[in-house]
């Protein structure tokens, strides 16, 4: 399984690409995690999930990531987005509402392994590799999916 995941990752991620991994990177030892990390292309950023112990316990694995955070609000330059920048909230877990969700911000998450139903009325999406044939999903792929959705608030905000 490791070899397939590494091959799939490297087939779509270039050496200079930024990759945001939304948690549960590894359930194995720090040493095995390091061997995997050293084979993966890209500038790796990690949003902590509930299975990061082996990655977080050793500095030699932590150092393979540009940063490690619990939560992150990403801004992507995109001429099609409002203000030419797409706001994206990254968290391991799915949320019903998130910062700027009422203003077109997307929410990307993992954790659920494709078990949550996709909501056409929510600009959120499960980007876990097990939901996408074990390949990382690109910004352009997410953008195509989000373009088919329409946000409808479920709380008191408009």
Task: Walk through the language-model features, giving the residues of each.
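Conserved beta-sheet core of the metallophosphoesterase superfamily
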Residues: 62-154
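Core catalytic region of metal-dependent phosphoesterases/phosphodiesterases
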Residues: 1-73
